[in-house]
Amino acid sequence: MESIIFRIMNLKELHQLEEEIEKISDTQEREARTKLIEQIVEKITDYDVHVRKYAYQQVVQALIDRGIILEPVIREPIITEWDNHFDCLVSDEAKQAAKYYSNQFRWHLFSFELLPAIQGDQARAAFNESKKGELYLFFDYADETYRVKNAHLLTADDIEALRENSSLNLSDMYFYDPLNKWTYIKPHEEYCGPYFFKAE
C-alpha cells in the first residue's frame, strides 16, 4: 500500500512550499506557517499509520478465518536457529569481500548472492509448493515472532498482502521452516526478492 502522504501530497511541491515559507521575512508568520505544515504532515502520517494498521489487521483476520493461526513465540531462539541454518553458511571473509554488503538485513545474504536463493515468481512458486512443517514468521526490526499453525494453508499471495499492508518495522518478513531447513523472505524493497532458499 502506497503511503497516504505520497497519494495526497506531492513531496516536491511540499519542499517548494517550505522554501517559499523560508523566504518570508516576518519571523512570526514564517514560524506559524512552518508549524501548520508540520501539523498537517503529522496528521497525514497518523492517518497513514491508522489505515495501514487496520488493513494489516484485516489481512490477518482473513488468514485466521481460513484456519491459519499466528501464535506469538519468543523471538531469540528462532533468530538464533535461523542464523545457525543460513547465516553461518557464509564466511565473514565472503561477506567482507562482497562490495557494499551490509548485515543490516538478513536478506542481504540473498540480495548480494552470497547464498544462491531462488527469486521472484520462482520463489513464490517454491514457497507454494514446499512442504510446510513447523513454520515461523519473524521480522528484522520488530520483536513480534510467530509460529504459523496450519501453514500448509498459507500462500505467497497471502504474504504479499501482509507485506503490502504492513508498517515499516514489519516490512521485512522472514518465514522459516526449521524441520525442512528452508526460508522464504519478503523484503521491504519492492525490487528485491522474494527469496526462497533451502539449506542442504
Q: Language model features by range: what are they?
A:
Residues M1-E200:
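Structured alpha/beta or helical-core interaction and ligand-binding surfaces enriched in interleaved
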